[in-house]
Amino acid sequence: MYEKQTLPNGVRIVYEHMPHVRSAAIGVWVGVGSRYESPCEAGSAHFIEHMLFKGTAQHSASELAERMDAIGGQVNAYTTREGTCYYARVLDEHLDRAGDLLAEMLFTSNFSETDADNERGVIREEMDMYADTPEDLVTERLIGAAFPGALGRPVLGRPATIDRLTGARLRSFQIAHYIAPRIVIAASGSFTDENIARLAAHFSWLPVRPDLTMRSGSYTPAFTLKRKAIEQNQISIGFPGLPTGAEERFTMALLSSILGGNMSSRLFQTVREKNGLCYAIYTYTASFLDCGMFGISAAVGRETEQRALALIRDELERFRTDGVTQSELDRAREQVHASVLMAEESTASRMNKLGYSELYLGRVLPADEVLARYDAVTREDILGLARETLDFDRVSFSAVGRLRPQEEYAQQLKG
């Protein structure tokens, strides 16, 4: 059972003891990602994530790296459209040191112009890496097209905006956005009350500040093509989805599992197993605080692309007309049951659940309640959501590769 403290300044601490483990995972979750940036600030949240590893008032970047390695654990971070997470997984005897290290990085980083110039090159290389990965590129372009504005902008920013972000501007962005109401500290594993008190002390000095205003987002049907000389065409189809906290999210997870979540799923069986038209095909959800998208991705040959798209459309139409069988629903439930319960055995997974749920949902659902929500979903619920979601009048499409004219894709998908 998890516990929660809220400090007087609004910082929240959620933690859960796991008996019989010798390690702990801690994370500092900051509810600030790329959708909180103005156009001229694009890429700031991600750039700051990099800069916090480049040296503090007490230690150089190399000394920070040595201190990380000296505790024999894993220390890292990542940025999304709606948040940034700095986390560590260590043996319980090193938990205080890991917490001290994260706090030092968060509050005393240098943001020197020399470090910013060097890290700018690293981020450009990261951009190039994603641009050379068609599976990532096609989804990034789909989200960018379907969610115009701040939400759709790349988390990494663009080269032109990155070039204008100085160390001083990044520090100003951090001061303005890393505020108490936006911070959640999550811990799971082996720890003591004293460990939690020490973590709290690192954040108790933050002043009380008004919360930030989020730039709104909404789904808009869009088509985007990127011509690239690669062997396979990477395609991604999008439909309007659900926001993070929607009650129907449990229904959507089962719908996604049945359509494209595993080897027995409809799309995998139809497009790959029965017709041999692809190696990989899967469904996914992209959920944000106020909107979302349901997506399907596949890698197909240029010569078989039209047939694969026709089969995908036919399967989706059949799904929204006929619904699912009881055996399909039973298999999907077992899949999510296994996923939920296996995650409960990992300190890192439980820490992530605590931090994510508190930050974006305002409440952590116990595993038993999550399973009960899945068990309550009926075939009729899935059919109703499928008919609402899989609407080809609101379809979006992204493709990367040796492509046909856009009108042909639009005609094939929209009819």
Model-derived regions, located:
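His/Glu-based metal-binding/catalytic segments typifying zinc-dependent metallopeptidases
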Residues: 27-29, 210-266, 403
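Charge-rich, well-structured scaffold segments of protease-associated domains
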Residues: 6, 17, 63-214, 225, ...
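Short strand-connecting beta-turns/loops that link adjacent beta-strands
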Residues: 19-22, 80, 230-231
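N- or domain-start disorder-to-order transition segments that initiate the globular core
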Residues: 1-23
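Short alpha-helix boundary/capping segments
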Residues: 36-43, 243-255, 259, 263, ...
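M16/MPP (pitrilysin/insulinase) zinc-metallopeptidase core fold and M16-derived inactive scaffolds
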Residues: 25-89, 258-277
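Conserved catalytic motifs of the protein kinase core domain
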Residues: 23-25, 293
